[in-house]
Every structure is written in C-alpha cells, then in structure tokens.
Design a protein with these regions (language model features):
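Conserved beta-strand signature within the Rossmann-like core of class I S-adenosyl-L-methionine
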Residues: 180-194
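Short amphipathic alpha-helix with an adjacent loop that forms part of the alpha/beta core around
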Residues: 139-150
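A short SAM/SAH-binding and catalytic strip from SAM-dependent methyltransferases
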Residues: 153-168
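Rossmann-like AdoMet/SAM-dependent catalytic core
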Residues: 199-279
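Rossmann-like AdoMet
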Residues: 1-83, 87-132, 150
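Conserved SAM/SAH-binding loop
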Residues: 133-137
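A short, conserved alpha-helix within the catalytic core of class I
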Residues: 138-140, 164-177
Length: 279
C-alpha cells in the first residue's frame, strides 16, 4: 500500500483548490480530474485557506490558467513533447491528450505511484513517467529511455517547485537540461524577492512573504529578484515574464483583485511567472 504521507498534504490541498474552481463566480479553468485527488479534509483546508488569505488560492488559480495557456500556445507553435516536472497531481497530459504532443512526467516515486493507483482505479492510464528526484537524476537520459526525444521541440512545465528547492541546486540542474535539450522552453513560477538572505526592501515585504508561508504551511528558501541570473549562469534567455497580478484583467478578475487590501495586492505582485528559452 502506498503511504500518502510521503506525498505531503500540500499536493492534496492544491488539487482541492482546483477541484473547487466550479464554485467560483468566474471559473478560470475546468479540471474534472482534480476531485480524484481531493478529500474532505483537503477541501476543508482549501476553503479555510481561501477564507483566511485569499491571495494564496488566487495564486494557484492564476498560475493554473497561465500554465494551461503555456501548453496550449506551445503546442500550437510546434512543440511536440511536454514534460511535467515535479507536477504532483497535474493532469495536463490527459487534458491535452488529443492536442498532438507526447507527454511525460517526472516526480518522486511515492507521488507517481499514488497517482498511477488513482488513475488505474478510474480506468485511465498514466503517461510515461520517470520516478526520480529530478535534481539528482539524469532527466534527459531517463526520459529518453521512455521514448522521449531530447532533440525535439519541448515544453517543460515547472509549476509550484522553485520556491521549495535549495538555491544552489537550480543552476546545475538547468545546465544539465540545456546540455541535452537544444530546443527547450521551460515555464515556472517564482517569488521575485531574495529568499536566500531574507533581505527585503521593507519589513512589509518580509511580512507579506511570511504570511504566504504560514498560509501554505511551508517555508520557501529560494526566490529570484533578478532574472538575468538565468542568462548569466545558464544558456537560457528570458522569453516571457510578468506578475500574476497583471493577468487579473485578462482573466476577468481585475475588479476582484482591485478590491483586495494593499498588502494582498502587493503579495500578488511578488509572485511571478517566467519562460526560459534555450539559446
């Protein structure tokens, strides 16, 4: 029997936030698979999180919509492979199974075994999956063993990961990817503040970040105040970046965000997206 405690409660809460999206006045996406990975406890936690600190669930909702569009546009532009990196219960491989791209997943063994068990119970097949700690594994090589073509145009969705990772691990990992994958676009979310030193411009910024950590019951060791680090220390260019708060108008939720207190809006501005493209 798979020990779901090895997966972590956060994955179930994130799935529950997605599962509760139809309850919103203006839903941003439809994820019919999310309830498979939810339960009463996780849904209660998601509702409590939304009531106590709405920006935390707004972040998840906005990023889900953003990464959906990243995949859709990338496939339209010719990408033929999509890698879901550390995606937990991400079901985009099934949402976009008829879009003309091959999907692959990379995550910890406990996560993917549990996911495979749930999918099997629902008559759905897990896509080719590499069971690994991606920071330590040969990801391109491991995926190639599953039918992945490292030379083909590839999208990588790196959602909800960077802020949890040891800062010293990220550039070596990206350089390993770049050395084997010449046509790679990788999208991720991040906090645009220096979480390593915890030196913020103002005490208010620190308090905002700590508020998110408390809401998510997590600690974030890594942020990127300057995206040029990816261009200096790895062979990538920044193809796209911005704050999730700026997407509120596009998503039809500008009025909702405008009504947030100043602190909440400033918190959303710290949470950003970035797309890197192999040079």
């Amino acid at each position: 029997m798979i020990d779901i405690n090895e997966i972590g409660a956060t994955a179930f809460v994130i799935a529950s936030i997605r599962a509760l999206e139809p309850e919103k006045p203006r839903p941003l996406f439809d994820d019919p698979y999310a309830p498979w990975f939810s339960n009463d406890r996780a849904r209660t936690a998601a509702r409590q999180l939304d009531a106590a600190f709405p920006p935390s669930t707004t972040m998840v909702r906005f990023r889900t919509r953003y990464f959906n569009r990243f995949v859709e546009r990338g496939i339209e532009d010719g990408a033929r492979q999509v890698v879901l990196l550390g995606g937990g219960f991400d079901m985009r491989a099934h949402h976009y199974r008829d879009a003309g791209a091959a999907f692959f997943e990379v995550d910890q063994k406990a996560v993917l075994e549990f996911k495979r068990h749930i999918l099997s119970d629902n008559g759905v097949e897990q896509p080719p999956s590499l069971f690994a700690n991606y920071l330590e594994a040969d990801v391109p090589g491991g995926l190639a063993d599953l039918g992945f073509d490292p030379a083909a145009p590839t999208l990588m969705v790196w959602e909800g990961n960077t802020m949890y990772l040891p800062p010293e691990s990220i550039m070596p990992f990206l350089n390993r990817l770049a050395s084997a994958m010449p046509s790679l676009r990788i999208a991720f979310d991040y906090f645009s503040v220096d979480l390593q030193s915890r030196e913020f411009d103002t005490d208010e910024d620190l308090k905002r970040l700590e508020g998110v950590e408390r809401a998510m019951n997590a600690s974030f060791p890594t942020g990127f105040p300057d995206l040029t680090v990816f261009e200096r220390e790895a062979p990538f260019g920044v193809a796209e970046s911005g704050t999730f708060a700026e997407l509120a108008e596009e998503y039809g939720l500008g009025e909702m965000v405008a009504e947030y207190p100043d602190d909440w809006r400033e918190t959303l501005k710290m949470y950003r997206y970035c797309v890197l493209e192999r040079r």
